[in-house]
């Protein structure tokens, strides 16, 4: 099992759309120095979010990308990439700065809008992770079928995202088991502790 720490991205939703420079640098160093192997950071709404939808963060995408440069190669470092906020140069920009991955995100059932985004990420030479946001919009079997389609599009790893944070452990298990039976790529689970069930 691997753990992705996305505090510096998803956690930034609490503050607005991102953490300031000093805190981002400090947390990135701390995560890397403590052996966290996969880290997602940057604008909470994803790379390109400011240009596409005005999601203002303390730093621009370029500034977030540059501040991580001393840590490139010491962990898998990447950013979120909402499919609805596609910009043709986002993936190349991420790759040019040494990021390991972009995690494409779209609501469950919306895989068709993600194809060009996934292709752009893959063409840039970095990994395309994928988050099935609001996974509960589909049944476990329906979501697993969508994951199979996404795997065929070239996705390297896929995440079941419980965006509302209401899934109980058995429900989460059903989604994971159904998906593992359909795909050959790693399957992840992204939850929120709204029910107080986290360990």
How should each PLM-predicted stretch be described?
Residues 49-79, 117-135, 173-189:
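Alpha-helix-loop-beta-strand connector modules within alpha/beta enzyme cores
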Residues 3-10, 39-41, 75-82, 100-104, ...:
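Hydrophobic faces of well-ordered beta-strands that scaffold small-molecule active sites
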Residues 1-6, 28-47:
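N-terminal glycine-rich anion-binding loops that anchor highly charged ligand groups
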């Amino acid at each position: 099992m691997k753990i992705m720490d996305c505090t510096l991205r998803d956690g930034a939703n609490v503050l607005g759309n991102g953490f300031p420079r000093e805190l981002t640098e400090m947390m990135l160093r701390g995560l890397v120095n403590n052996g966290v192997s996969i880290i997602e950071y940057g604008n909470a709404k994803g790379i390109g979010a400011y240009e596409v939808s005005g999601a203002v963060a303390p730093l621009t995408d370029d500034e977030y990308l540059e501040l991580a440069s001393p840590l490139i190669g010491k962990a898998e470092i990447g950013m979120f990439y909402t499919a609805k906020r596609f910009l043709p140069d986002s993936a190349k920009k991420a790759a040019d700065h040494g990021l390991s991955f972009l995690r494409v995100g779209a609501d469950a059932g919306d895989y068709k809008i993600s194809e060009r985004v996934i292709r752009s990420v893959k063409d840039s030479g970095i990994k395309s992770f994928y988050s099935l946001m609001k996974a509960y919009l589909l049944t476990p079997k329906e979501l697993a079928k969508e994951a199979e389609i996404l795997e065929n599009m070239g996705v390297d790893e896929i995440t079941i995202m419980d965006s509302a944070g209401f899934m109980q452990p058995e429900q989460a298990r059903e989604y994971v088991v159904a998906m593992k039976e359909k795909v050959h790529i790693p399957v992840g689970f992204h939850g929120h502790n709204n029910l107080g069930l986290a360990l």
